[in-house]
Structures are given as C-alpha cells and as structure tokens.
Amino acid sequence: MKLISASLRRFSLAVLTILLVVSSFAVFTPSASAETYQVKLGTDKGLLAFEPKKLTIKPGDTIEWVNNKVPPHNVVFDPAKNPSKNADLAKSLSHKKLLMSAGQKETTTFAADAPAGDYTFYCEPHRGAGMVGTITVQG
C-alpha cells in the first residue's frame, strides 16, 4: 500500500511539474504585436503619389496617413478592389474628408479578422493623376 501511495505522489508531482512548465510557455511567449506603418500623401519631391505606394501588413496593423505635399488629399478604399468586394468594409477603412494642411493625419486599423489579400486605395482629387496605392494584408 505504501508503494502505491508513494508512486501516486511521484506521478502527481511529475504531472504538476509538466503543467507548470507548459503553462510558463504560454505566459512568457511574446505575443505578435500590431505594427503601425506611415504612408505619406504626396511624396517628399512634391509628386502626386502615395509614399510608399505598396505596403504589406498583417491583420491588426494600423496605417497612419500623413498629409505631406500638394494638398488636398484623402484616402478612399475601392469597394470593388478588396478581397471581399465589400462596400461597407471599404467605407470603414476610408477617410473621405480632405486633409488640407501638411502634417494632418488620419489612421486606418485593419481588424484582426480582416480578409487577406490586396486592398486598392486612392486619393479622390488626384486619382486621375495616378495617385493610387495597394495595401496587401497577409493571411
């Protein structure tokens, strides 16, 4: 009987030790933190373009749009050119209000469950001049 009791105690101690070690990995594993990226509206050289024009992000990341040169600018996501072709999603990501002064900022955060793929955006006043860009959300 003492042998069974001692074996049971050792087994319980081993199980508790394993649980403690495994749970410590969950506590000390760094979580993937969201990043913030900056996109300039108008290049430093005064061109009507986004800088950078193409950007790859992960769900949960944020884009900070900074009015740089040759205003006014805004950021509109094309409802026909996002992975889900969802007009409400495009509207929620867009900032249609014109930024008139250099240094003005807006932010767009892609939800943690944002569909992976390419999202096309443009500046309404300068779309005809080619002020268009792409955000690629990784899956």
Swiss-Prot record:
Cu cation binds at H73, C123, H126, M131. One of its GO terms (molecular function) is electron transfer activity. It is found in: Cellular thylakoid membrane. Its cofactor is Cu(2+). Residues 35-139 form the Plastocyanin-like domain. One of its GO terms (cellular component) is plasma membrane-derived thylakoid membrane. Keywords: Copper, Electron transport, Membrane, Metal-binding, Signal, Thylakoid, Transport. Residues 1-34 form the signal peptide. InterPro entries: BlueCu_1, BlueCu_1_BS, Copper_blue_Plastocyanin, Cupredoxin, Plastocyanin, Plastocyanin_cyanobac. Transmembrane segments: none annotated. It is a peripheral membrane protein. Participates in electron transfer between P700 and the cytochrome b6-f complex in photosystem I. PANTHER family: PLASTOCYANIN MAJOR ISOFORM, CHLOROPLASTIC-RELATED. Belongs to the plastocyanin family. This is Plastocyanin. It comes from Nostoc punctiforme (strain ATCC 29133 / PCC 73102). The lineage of its organism: Bacteria, Bacillati, Cyanobacteriota, Cyanophyceae, Nostocales.
